């Protein structure tokens, strides 16, 4: 599950039911079932990284299972050698603080983009050198379908696309932040990598944030 510098991660707490509909389930039995399923699917004895999906209650439904129970289930599986590291997905700062009393947290996966960038966990991740994976970096496509004029103008300045500028802005927020880019088109994936070479000035980043009425 780990090769060529890549680490495969999986996520528990969300699964499809009998009619192929996503539902939340972070119960102890569901977590064990999901981990065992991922082990079989990936053909490995140990998962490098498993995220516990929580849900912040704003954008995504939260499972009623107490966080401590869910984490203890993962810690037990970890002690059995079935997973190496534990991360949190869609978590709040209180979630993180509680989790750290139970087990080390190796990575964070939260929603973060130009439209939604108020997450105090990023500051913690930066200070602790903990990878922070930003999902929905293009605001579920809104920054592509209806790119604000100021974003388009900034993209023109850097001879880039609005998506590339949005990703470059994310990368500049923290050395620990990594945008999660989802695509089925290899060309689109290559286009996104251009964001790595875009060095936006601090002034331009501030202008973009101010124009979009963002909070730092």
Positions of the model-derived regions?
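A short, structured active-site edge motif that brings together acidic residues
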Residues: 4-18, 52
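Short, acidic/polar
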Residues: 27-41, 92-96
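Acidic (Asp/Glu)-rich catalytic clusters
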Residues: 1-7, 39-43, 100-101, 123-128
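Non-cysteine beta-strand/loop elements that form the S-adenosyl-L-methionine
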Residues: 9-11, 49-50, 133-137
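Beta/alpha (TIM)-barrel catalytic core signal, keyed to glycine-rich beta->alpha loops juxtaposed to Asp/Glu
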Residues: 55-216
């Amino acid at each position: 599950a780990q090769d060529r510098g890549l680490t495969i991660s999986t996520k528990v707490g969300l699964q499809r039911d009998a009619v192929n509909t996503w539902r939340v389930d972070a119960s102890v039995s569901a977590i064990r079932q999901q981990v065992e399923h991922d082990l079989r699917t990936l053909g490995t004895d140990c998962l490098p990284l498993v995220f516990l999906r929580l849900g912040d209650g704003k954008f995504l439904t939260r499972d009623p299972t107490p966080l401590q129970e869910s984490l203890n289930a993962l810690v037990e599986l970890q002690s059995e050698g079935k997973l190496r590291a534990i991360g949190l997905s869609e978590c709040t700062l209180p979630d993180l603080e509680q989790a750290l009393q139970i087990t080390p947290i190796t990575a964070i996966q939260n929603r973060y983009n130009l439209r939604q960038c108020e997450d105090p966990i990023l500051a913690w991740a930066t200070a602790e050198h903990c990878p922070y994976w930003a999902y929905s970096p293009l605001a579920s496509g809104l920054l592509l379908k209806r790119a604000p004029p100021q974003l388009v103008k900034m993209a023109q300045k850097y001879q880039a696309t609005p998506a590339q500028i949005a990703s470059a802005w994310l990368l500049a927020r923290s050395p620990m932040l990594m945008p999660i880019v989802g695509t089925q088109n290899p060309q689109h994936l290559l286009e996104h990598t251009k964001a790595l070479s875009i060095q936006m000035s601090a002034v331009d980043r501030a202008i973009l944030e101010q124009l979009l009425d963002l909070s730092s």
